């Protein structure tokens, strides 16, 4: 549903919509993580057809990387914080595959979810550096009723882990609301609120 929201937005703003479905091996620094990453190609194609996607590009790793990958991008601090701090090389892998996809498809616009905000920033930087005439469109996060952001990886979470992830989002959201509506004198009560999570 999260990815389909990107297709829906793209359909409204473009004559032709092309979607890529590819689990990119070079953005995983942990082989076990790559191995367990959810893959449902038949379901993906069915959902994309239902959403009205005009073409699906589903290459193999051999087609995308027939030769040894030697490209390297340096995004500076942008790739060394948050997710990049614990996944070295991840954003270089993202940049390489996105560059290849852009050069194959040559889109006018490309749609990415704001859920992966750091990735979105990396891709915007890549487009600027490479001077691609592509508009990068960030699309809002789609959430489950519980508030948990939709993700293919959610199926890997136990019920308890899902509840914890949901509570993290609730705590962040409520802390922002609290900060925006309360004054400094009331901040002591925030500790009570925080301890509840």
Task: List the model feature ranges, each with a label.
Residues 1-197:
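Nucleotidyltransferase catalytic core that binds NTPs
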